[in-house]
Amino acid sequence: MAQQFDYPKTETQLREIQDALYQHSKEVYEAGGRPAFKGLLEIMSAESTIITAIHNIKGNHGSETPGVDSKTMRKDYLQKPFPWVVADIQRAFKYFEPQQIRRVYIDKPGKSEKRPLGIPAIRDRIVQECMRIVLEPILEAQFFAHSYGFRPMRDAAMALERVDIIMHNTGNYWIVEGDISKCFDRIDHSILIKRLYHMGIKDRRVLQIIKAMLKAGVMEECAVNEEGTPQGGLISPLLANVYLDIMDEWVSKQWENKRTRHQYVQDQSRYVMRKKTTLVPGYLVRYADDFIIATDTRAHAEDWKARLQSFLQEKMKLTLSQEKTLITDIRKKYIKFLGYEFKMVRGKSRRGYIPRTI
């Protein structure tokens, strides 16, 4: 039965609802099921949610970057009467028609090429933030434990620490360095919407708004966007993680999260028992679309690469870059991950190797 909550009357009540959404989602997921939520649009369009969204956006210097309508947060919302602002956003939810996205190009760190960034209109940004506030706790409770990009209380340092732990504890030194070709530009809208529904977003009005957001075209380029999530939208990182969670779930169920007949309290006990099976070891660490899979032999690494390529094509309509997806023995060569170079070198440890990061 779908869960439904009253709309929040204060920002304190909104935080309580966020906690309740997370807790219920987590409990159902950990019990082996998936949650179901309806009535989410009422929470998203509540006055307290709109206030919170505006506070979140105005603290970002990007709030003064105009979209195609040339409007900014300070001039067109913060200086307007409060009842007008709330009514305008609630009207946007009721009759949602996103404006086209203004595209700008920014430099990629350490590279000569530029990255496209989509700038939604300020009203659409507020709507997106209202939606993110409500959707994030539901989805966060179900995401893979070792994806670290664009998530609360997580960062690249934690991803690197996880790699260190895997190397130290398992001795899985063969690495598949994953690179998905134009990942964010090729996200399939239909698969994404189905995944959101699968993860508990049963309010079809919310799904229709997300679908409209995804299809908002880019000014001077196209009227309708048929695939991808616009980089620059406030909800885009969350939606990208929802999509890539399909891959996370598939990889982790092959080894790390594969259910065993007996439930082991300690991960090490589970690891020892799995080593006695014919399963192929595979430890995934992901940060946005950058990821590695650690395994124990070259043959297993090549097996992971081939099976992952097939899975991405068949289930997600994505493609591994054959040139950039590498197989590396990190006892002999550095891997590049999240701007760092990582290698195992001879040293005093139980396995005879210690990590070195540059």
Q: What is each residue range found by the language model?
A:
Residues 1-83:
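Non-catalytic, polymerase-adjacent accessory regions of viral genome-replication enzymes
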Residues 76, 120, 294-296:
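Short hydrophobic/aromatic beta-strand micro-patches
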Residues 2, 13, 117-132, 142-143, ...:
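Duplex nucleic acid-engaging cores and interfaces of nucleic-acid transaction enzymes
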Residues 86, 111-114:
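Structured, charged N-terminal subsegments at the starts of enzyme catalytic cores
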Residues 68, 133, 178-180, 297, ...:
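Residues immediately flanking
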Residues 77-98:
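Amphipathic alpha-helical blocks
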Residues 85, 100, 104, 145-146, ...:
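Conserved polymerase palm-domain catalytic core
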Residues 349-358:
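Basic, alpha-helical interaction scaffolds
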